[in-house]
């Protein structure tokens, strides 16, 4: 590098080191935003939640009211999707049965990461009124898929659904990309276990072929003077009938 001899020492220093640390003034500090990739990523996802609506019972009626203009849930950026591959939030509303459980797990597995779950209603969380004597109701959807937000109620109001979405947004804003795969569900709702005893099949397929269906009852047959079928006679009555004959 060849420098002009007519330049002063200060000018030479500026040419050699053109980049210097600038003084941060009050005006400059108000125009600079410092953030991280995690914060930017979480901020972008806060207003772009696309829910997959999984309604199986009466709780879904309240969610249908939320879609209306009175509550306007579009202000949160929620766009209902019909395909799990386009959704990052699934809202389970209603009773989950044993037959429906594999389909729910399959829909959850088809959703891309990161994905979230809101359990809406008492029947989804603990089985509700079906958790006592129903052999087909699942005692809590968290036995099938991890739940991020529990929304109790029978059914919960649309205002409660909005509150659950706000709580989920707060959870998303505090997440990290590196720690997302390491987070696992630790706390679950208490739910009762099955206390039912297995019994033999009641419906054998031969109900119409039974003796009581092919012939009238014994009292009715005696009243109208019809011969009593042998199937309705006891051993003692059969012996008496034989001795008479």
From Swiss-Prot:
- What detail does the entry give on cofactor binding? Binds 1 [4Fe-4S] cluster.
EC number of this enzyme: 7.1.1.-
Q: What class of enzyme is it?
A: translocase
Stated name of the protein: NAD(P)H-quinone oxidoreductase subunit K
Task: Give the record's GO CC terms.
Answer: plasma membrane-derived thylakoid membrane; respiratory chain complex I
Extract the ranges annotated as region (Disordered): 210-245
Q: Does the keyword rRNA processing apply?
A: no
The entry describes its oligomerization and partners as: NDH-1 can be composed of about 15 different subunits; different subcomplexes with different compositions have been identified which probably have different functions.
Which domain of life does the protein's organism represent? Bacteria
The UniProt keyword set, sorted, is:
4Fe-4S, Iron, Iron-sulfur, Membrane, Metal-binding, NAD, NADP, Plastoquinone, Quinone, Thylakoid, Translocase, Transport
Q: Which InterPro entries match?
A: NADH_UbQ_OxRdtase-like_20kDa, NADH_UQ_OxRdtase_20Kd_su
Compartment list: Cellular thylakoid membrane
**Which residues lie in Basic and acidic residues bias regions?**
236-245
Q: Give me the residues that bind [4Fe-4S] cluster, please.
A: 58-59, 123, 154
Molecular function GO labels: 4 iron, 4 sulfur cluster binding; iron ion binding; NADH dehydrogenase (ubiquinone) activity; quinone binding
**Reactions catalysed:** a plastoquinone + NADH + (n+1) H(+)(in) = a plastoquinol + NAD(+) + n H(+)(out); a plastoquinone + NADPH + (n+1) H(+)(in) = a plastoquinol + NADP(+) + n H(+)(out)
| Origin organism lineage | Bacteria, Bacillati, Cyanobacteriota, Cyanophyceae, Nostocales
- List required co-factors: [4Fe-4S] cluster
Query: Per its UniProt record, what Gene3D superfamilies does this chain match?
Result: 3.40.50.12280
């Amino acid at each position: 590098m060849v420098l002009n001899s007519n330049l002063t020492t200060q000018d030479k220093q500026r040419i050699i080191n053109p980049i210097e640390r600038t003084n941060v003034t009050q005006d400059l500090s108000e125009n600079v935003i410092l953030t991280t990739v995690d914060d930017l990523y979480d901020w972008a996802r806060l207003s772009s939640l696309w829910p997959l609506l999984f309604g199986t019972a009466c709780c879904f009626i309240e969610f249908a009211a939320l879609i209306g203009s009175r509550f306007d849930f579009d202000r949160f950026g929620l766009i209902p999707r019909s395909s799990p591959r386009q959704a990052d939030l699934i809202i389970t509303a209603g009773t989950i049965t044993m037959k429906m459980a594999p389909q729910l797990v399959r829909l959850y597995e088809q959703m891309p990461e990161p994905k979230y779950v809101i359990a809406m209603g008492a029947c989804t969380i603990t089985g509700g009124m079906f958790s006592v004597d129903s052999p087909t109701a699942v005692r809590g959807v968290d036995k099938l898929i991890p739940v991020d937000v529990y929304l109790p109620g029978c059914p919960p109001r649309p205002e409660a659904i909005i509150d659950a979405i706000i709580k989920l947004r707060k959870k998303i804003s505090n997440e990290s990309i590196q720690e997302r795969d390491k987070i696992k569900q630790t706390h679950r709702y208490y739910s009762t276990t099955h206390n039912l005893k297995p019994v033999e099949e009641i419906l054998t397929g031969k109900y119409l072929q039974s003796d009581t269906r092919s012939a009238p009852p014994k009292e009715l047959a005696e009243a109208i003077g019809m011969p009593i079928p042998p199937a309705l006679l006891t051993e003692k009555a059969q012996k008496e009938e034989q001795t008479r004959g």
